[in-house]
Amino acid sequence: MAQQRRGGRRRRKVDFIAANHIEYIDYKDTDLLRRFISERGKILPRRVTGTSAKNQRRLTIAIKRARIMGLLPFVAED
């Protein structure tokens, strides 16, 4: 028997940075940056977080800077 698909509209993700009026994404703000990193330490994509392209680029740069400075890990510790 064929299964029926359950339809439904998914809720549009909101850009957290734009919604909270964050002008500058600081690499030293690790609490903010950790929201956009997976448990394994990877940067989460836009389709998961809902950030705009501009803010995703800024986040990526800030996360990479924080990793180099030693504020964030490159990979998660098991």
Curated annotation (Swiss-Prot):
GO molecular function, one term: structural constituent of ribosome
Function field: Binds as a heterodimer with protein bS6 to the central domain of the 16S rRNA, where it helps stabilize the platform of the 30S subunit.
Domain of life according to the entry: Bacteria
Keywords noted in UniProt: Ribonucleoprotein, Ribosomal protein, RNA-binding, rRNA-binding
Protein name per UniProt: Small ribosomal subunit protein bS18
Source species of the chain: Limosilactobacillus fermentum (strain NBRC 3956 / LMG 18251) (Lactobacillus fermentum)
One Gene Ontology cellular component: cytosolic small ribosomal subunit
Any coiled-coil regions, as ranges: none
Biological processes annotated in GO: translation
NCBIfam families hit by this protein: S18
Family, as annotated: Belongs to the bacterial ribosomal protein bS18 family.
Membrane spanning residue stretches: none
Oligomeric form and interacting partners: Part of the 30S ribosomal subunit. Forms a tight heterodimer with protein bS6.
